């Protein structure tokens, strides 16, 4: 697939630092930001004046944060202040309506966002209309794929941080995702009306924990219940929110008691920008005071270059400080023409091609989300090049299938607005397109392909069976639909246990799908106990020498393979805590002179990877194993691809057991938050679950503990946490790495697997 400047930065973001050497680094594709800027300017030279005007007033943004930081409440204010909705509805409002962006019944009942929701809104700034495509994303780690696919197609984001809790576990996850897709952000410190709100501590945490240069461009007027508005440090004016819902902005002079603080924070802003912007650095060296225009320009340049994030503050729930964030989105976040997007030209040996956001260019778009709507499958598309028009035909670059678009819509949560066309840089949805998330579409004039989003592996599984055998048809429909919608939701049938197994990112993730099956398909299911996704690997090398011989009259089977099996992982580095177990399996052939024909080697390769799907210890997937074949024998009559396939499979199992095999269990990063009086109870609970505590953050109201714990210890943890914190604690889990389980647990798992196999043999 694609090597995109925007999309494939799994190894790290194109991060920049204040230092000259770091400014030259670009971990994605080996280019500097200046080189990227040169490409942007070159592409802008190939678009029309109409394209430039249209794109300059367009923003594709996401709202991301830790769970319960106020993302959806903030999104509701955006809808209200832009005139998209006529009244404000809260996430847990008393009017029974619920937030507009949480359109699923389950979301409104649980008070959390499960699916990302998109909307289109218009904001007027300085008498200019700016058009926003806004995507509100979930905060819970179990629904991380919703954040991944949103950030994949967005040009900028608003990172919402709680003024009381500061940077939390999922904040750090979202930060990594933004870096993966090179998405610049502005930061909004929310909940400034809460007791214990400390925006300066939150900014310090952004700098320290996220390793991102951040500085305030606002100072709050008042605090907690007396929060009245904000002072704009750049423009040096005060903004007050008046009206019943804070809809009226009153501009005034800076309050006398805040002038000293504003001057201090303005100096700090200039110092921070001097580290990342040459123009401000020159002013700083010459001891000149930058003008407002110079500061605004520097903030925009540094934000788009992802070397800096401007920090705004307020309270979405109290209707304070939201409108200035909308202005900041217009002023500091990039429009679609400021971002380099690259595809591969399949007909030209996958040569990278920069996409031009011009209306007259050949159409190129990416399907980033599928949803089952009232009128069939709804496919969300981001248009990167050209125009998408109602009635035109588009071609799936992967399958070659052609589809005529009968309907184009802009989304407003679960409502739709029909449109005749959408241009480059826009997001829309359509019906009747058979595809998967991440598929590229063109109009047939070009053969381009774009990369998909990063999809993490599931960490938890459970068996599921419909109670009523008459529901099997609907059960199958639900499974097929959910898999198409969510790449992190996996389904497979276990031939040994004769059970359907579903896998996902956590207990809540699977619980939601079981509940959706009941509500949307009227299928009530029984579920087994959640099972950990164990893995198997080896820790030492051993020689491989296996002969498969079978004679049964006529042509028999003969294959001999000689070589070695060894761990891919550097075990010394693992033992020293400098590395984790490798995830890939590697097959190598060093056969010379045609001693084993190439077609038999290919059969060995396929058999090796197939066999690695089920290890000999517990039937779990094998990872981090290398098989080398450097010798062997064949028989002129009896050797075949099947014989070498069997020899590889049996040789794999036999040698695997000689390589000091171990079972690996998923280790999770766990973060607990509760009122400070429960600190002792949280520590005791972590110790009880054999967690290794790595960090404590004790605030005025809350205490946060972070550490690592095996997933096996975390089942039922929510119940124990509620009990020891009187229902006031919360926790989050995120997969960290695989590590060997204890010898005692390994023996238990191996014995249980052997008993299961014996029971199946006896049953036959």
From Swiss-Prot:
Transit peptide range is 1-23
Pathway membership of this protein?
A: Protein biosynthesis; polypeptide chain elongation
GO MF: GTP binding; GTPase activity; translation elongation factor activity
Domain tr-type G span(s) in chain numbering = 56-337
Q: Name one GO cellular component term.
A: mitochondrion
Q: Briefly state the protein's biological role.
A: Mitochondrial GTPase that catalyzes the GTP-dependent ribosomal translocation step during translation elongation. During this step, the ribosome changes from the pre-translocational (PRE) to the post-translocational (POST) state as the newly formed A-site-bound peptidyl-tRNA and P-site-bound deacylated tRNA move to the P and E sites, respectively. Catalyzes the coordinated movement of the two tRNA molecules, the mRNA and conformational changes in the ribosome.
Q: HAMAP family from the xrefs? A: EF_G_EF_2_B (MF_00054_B)
In Swiss-Prot or TrEMBL terms, this protein is called: Elongation factor G, mitochondrial
Source organism of this protein record: Yarrowia lipolytica (strain CLIB 122 / E 150) (Yeast)
């Amino acid at each position: 697939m694609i090597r995109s400047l925007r999309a494939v930065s799994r190894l790290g973001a194109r991060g920049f630092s204040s230092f000259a050497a770091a400014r030259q680094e670009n971990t994605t594709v080996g280019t500097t930001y200046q080189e990227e800027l040169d490409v942007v300017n070159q592409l802008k030279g190939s678009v029309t004046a109409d394209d430039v005007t249209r794109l300059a007033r367009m923003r594709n943004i996401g709202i991301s944060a830790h769970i319960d930081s106020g993302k959806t409440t903030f999104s509701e204010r955006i809808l209200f202040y832009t005139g998209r909705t006529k009244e404000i509805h809260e996430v847990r409002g008393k009017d029974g309506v619920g937030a507009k962006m949480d359109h699923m019944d389950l979301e409104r009942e649980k008070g959390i966002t499960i699916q990302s929701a998109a909307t289109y809104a218009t904001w007027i700034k300085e008498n200019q209309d700016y058009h926003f495509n806004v995507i509100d994303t979930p905060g819970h780690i179990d629904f991380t794929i919703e954040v991944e696919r949103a950030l994949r197609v967005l040009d900028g984001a608003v990172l919402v941080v709680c003024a009381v809790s500061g940077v939390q576990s999922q904040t750090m996850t979202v930060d990594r995702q933004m870096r993966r897709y090179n998405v610049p952000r502005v930061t909004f410190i929310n909940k400034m009306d809460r007791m214990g709100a400390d925006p300066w501590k939150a900014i310090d945490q952004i700098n320290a924990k996220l390793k991102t240069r951040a500085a305030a461009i606002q100072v709050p007027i008042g605090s907690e219940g007396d929060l009245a508005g904000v002072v704009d440090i750049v423009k040096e004016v005060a903004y007050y929110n008046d009206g019943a819902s804070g809809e009226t902005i009153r501009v005034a002079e800076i309050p006398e008691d805040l002038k000293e603080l504003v001057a201090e924070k303005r100096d700090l802003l200039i110092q921070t920008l001097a580290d990342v912007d040459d123009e401000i650095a020159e002013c700083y060296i010459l001891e000149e005071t930058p003008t407002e225009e110079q500061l605004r320009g520097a903030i925009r340049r540094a934000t788009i270059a992802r070397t800096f994030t401007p920090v705004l503050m307020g309270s979405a729930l109290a209707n304070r400080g939201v409108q200035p964030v909308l202005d900041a989105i217009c002023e500091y976040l990039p429009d679609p023409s400021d971002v380099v997007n690259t595809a591969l030209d399949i007909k030209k040996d996958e040569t990278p091609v920069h996409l031009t956001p011009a209306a007259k260019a050949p159409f190129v778009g990416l399907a980033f989300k599928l949803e089952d709507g009232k009128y069939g499958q709804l496919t969300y598309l981001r248009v990167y090049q050209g125009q998408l028009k109602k009635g035109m035909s588009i071609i799936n670059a992967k399958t070659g299938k052609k589809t005529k678009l009968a309907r184009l819509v802009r989304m407003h949560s679960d409502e739709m607005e029909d449109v005749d066309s959408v241009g480059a840089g826009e997001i829309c949805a359509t019906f009747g397109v058979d595809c998967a998330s991440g598929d590229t579409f063109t109009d047939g004039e070009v053969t381009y392909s774009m990369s998909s989003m990063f999809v993490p592996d599931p960490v938890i599984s459970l068996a599921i069976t419909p109670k009523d055998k008459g529901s099997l048809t609907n059960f199958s429909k639900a499974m097929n639909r959910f898999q198409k919608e969510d790449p992190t939701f996996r389904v497979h049938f276990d031939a040994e246990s004769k059970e359907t197994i579903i896998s996902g990112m956590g207990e809540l993730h699977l619980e939601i799908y079981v509940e959706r099956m009941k509500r949307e398909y009227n299928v009530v299911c029984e579920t087994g106990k959640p099972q950990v996704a164990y893995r198997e690997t080896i820790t030492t090398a051993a020689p491989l020498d296996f002969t498969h011989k079978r004679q049964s009259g006529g042509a028999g089977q003969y294959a001999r393979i000689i070589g070695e099996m060894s761990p891919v992982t550097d075990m010394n580095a693992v033992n020293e805590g400098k590395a984790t177990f490798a995830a890939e399996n590697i097959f190598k052939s060093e056969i010379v002179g045609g001693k084993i024909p190439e077609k038999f080697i290919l059969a060995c390769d396929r058999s090796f990877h197939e066999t690695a799907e089920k290890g000999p210890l517990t039937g779990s997937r094998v990872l981090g194993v290398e098989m080398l074949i450097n010798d062997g024998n064949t028989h002129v009559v009896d050797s075949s691809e099947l014989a070498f396939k069997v020899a590889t499979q049996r040789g794999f199992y036999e040698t695997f057991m000689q390589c000091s095999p171990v079972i690996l269990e998923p280790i999770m990063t766990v973060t607990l938050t509760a009122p400070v009086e429960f600190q002792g109870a949280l520590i005791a609970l972590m110790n009880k679950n054999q967690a290794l505590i790595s960090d404590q953050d004790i605030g005025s109201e809350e205490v946060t503990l972070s550490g690592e714990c095996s997933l096996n210890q975390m089942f039922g943890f929510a119940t124990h946490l509620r009990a020891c914190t009187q229902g006031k604690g919360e926790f989050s889990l995120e997969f960290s790495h695989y590590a060997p389980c204890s010898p005692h647990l390994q023996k238990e798992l191996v014995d249980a697997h052997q008993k299961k196999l014996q029971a199946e043999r006896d049953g036959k």
